[in-house]
């Protein structure tokens, strides 16, 4: 990430603390990798993601209120959490640019977004399975322990990096975790899209808008595996900014879908 002075490091620290020094807090522009162009693009990307995430959470909350009694509450709550946590991630990214705050655990927050998206995709399939598959409920009960393990991975990454810094082991766990979470979500997405009985339904349409968000959001924390492999961290951060923009773009189309769905309720 960046040093307290705002200069991007070429290799990840292995033992330095992750949250920076509160005593040296300053408000002002802090360049990423001493690169004004990268800093500007990153700032725009984070502001864009924050604005879209707030809107996404807003429409998820409205859909939840409009769907009371329909059995879709958990799905809308998952999507509301996606928007809320993505907003936190984006705002932290903005603060890293306009203040001396250094939240090296930031990508761990996006890892939580990836997990929430995967669980939302699972919930889409779960809701459809209850209406088309009598065995759907019992199948999902056996997955709770696995999902709790996923939550534990997110906690280890966020709090581990916050306390210990960008250790290679934690970056590896973050990257692998993102890929595993995405695989979990895409497993249910594939099963959903292959089910002829639910094709063309609201749930099917929503799923097809969520999968691109899941794919692009996964790449942001997953690309840190390149850091572990020895790629210059400045290059990795350039890639992460690109993937943040792609995530925001995909989330915007999903937000439009939530707004359209609200009009049909």
Can you describe what each PLM-predicted range is?
Residues 1-37:
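Short, strongly hydrophobic alpha-helical membrane anchors
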Residues 24-31, 65-68, 88-106, 223-235:
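Helix-loop junctions on the outward
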Residues 25-40, 152-175:
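Membrane-helix boundary elements
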Residues 38-52, 74-134, 138-145, 171-181, ...:
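Individual alpha-helical transmembrane segments in multi-pass integral membrane proteins
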Residues 48-56, 71-97, 152-157, 208-228:
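Hydrophobic alpha-helical transmembrane segments of multi-pass membrane proteins
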Residues 54-57, 90, 110, 114-123, ...:
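C-terminal transmembrane-bundle signature of multipass membrane proteins
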Residues 54-72, 159-162, 191-196:
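Short, flexible domain-boundary/linker segments around small modular repeats
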Residues 66-82, 139-148, 201-210:
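Membrane-interfacial loop-to-transmembrane alpha-helix junctions, especially the N-terminal start
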């Amino acid at each position: 990430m960046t040093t307290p002075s705002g200069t991007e490091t070429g290799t990840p620290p292995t033992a330095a603390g992750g949250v920076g020094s509160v005593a040296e807090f300053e408000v002002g522009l802090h360049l990423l990798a001493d690169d004004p162009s990268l800093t500007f693009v990153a700032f725009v990307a984070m502001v864009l993601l924050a604005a879209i995430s707030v809107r996404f959470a807003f429409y998820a909350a409205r859909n939840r209120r409009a769907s009371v009694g329909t059995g879709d509450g958990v799905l809308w709550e998952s999507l509301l959490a996606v928007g809320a946590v993505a907003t936190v991630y984006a705002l932290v990214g903005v603060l890293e640019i306009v203040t001396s705050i250094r939240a090296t655990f930031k990508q761990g927050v996006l890892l939580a977004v990836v997990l929430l998206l995967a669980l939302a995709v699972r919930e889409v399939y779960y809701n459809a399975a209850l209406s088309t598959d009598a065995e759907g409920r019992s199948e999902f009960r056996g997955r709770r322990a696995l999902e709790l393990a996923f939550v534990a991975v997110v906690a280890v990454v966020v709090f581990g990096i916050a306390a210990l810094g960008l250790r290679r082991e934690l970056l590896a766990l973050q990257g692998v975790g993102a890929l595993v979470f995405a695989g979990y979500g895409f497993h249910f997405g594939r099963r959903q899209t292959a089910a002829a009985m639910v094709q063309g339904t609201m749930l099917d349409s929503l799923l097809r808008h969520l999968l691109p968000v899941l794919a692009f959001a996964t790449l942001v924390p997953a690309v840190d595996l390149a850091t572990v492999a020895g790629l210059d961290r400045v290059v990795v951060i350039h890639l992460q900014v690109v993937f943040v923009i792609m995530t925001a773009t995909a989330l915007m189309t999903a937000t439009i879908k939530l707004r359209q769905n609200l009009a049909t309720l």
